[in-house]
Amino acid sequence: MAIYHLEAKMVSRGAGRSAVAAAAYLSCSRMLNEYDGVQHDYTRKQGLGWRQVFLPATAPAEWQDRETLWNAVEETETAKDSRLAREFVAALPIELSREKQIQLLQDFIKEQFVADGMCADAAIHDPYPPGHNPHAHILLTVRPLDEKGKWQYKTEKEYLCVKDGEERGFTAAEFKQAQADGWEKQYQYKVGKKKVYMSPSAAQAQGYERVSKYPKSTKFGRQNPITERWNSDEQLVLW
């Protein structure tokens, strides 16, 4: 019977880790981290079954070389405590052949990560005895690439606005046009004993006092309606 195991970790310079070292371990290879001059050698590690670099169409072709890719990431992140990459470790069904395991991983990575502009580096490790514990390592860039092949921000604020009773979210870049189209930012106002988000025009008409000067925003980009639903009080009660 197939088992389920998925572990997600952050590769952070603040924790003493590097993306180059993680990629060298994943690929069982020797790589030089140009950021600190440290060479990481995992060529003696056994059990490598497959490895591949996945790039969006806008990525530089030379990033197919994983050492070049992850050194580019290290160069971009200059802070001493930078988050460099996301790392996933997932168990693979032993019932599947190696070819099907690879196909499963390729489809998953392309659909879930590369389609959103992320670069990914993946490998299958199958330690001795073979077939006993096959698992996948996936190393993912924290920043996506834009249509010009440039790194985007790790996080992006989204302003939630209202117009004619409809609520929508806009990034900072989109808000100027949204404002011209009549959309209003929402702020917190005191309504009785509660704090309620609404537009300034609606609050002024009802005489409510604003309690926050900051507009409503989602800290980490566009809201995921599925996640929001399953984290709602209603769903928690049902659970």
Describe these PLM feature segments.
Residues 1-239:
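N-terminal nicking endonuclease/strand-transfer module with a His-rich metal-binding environment
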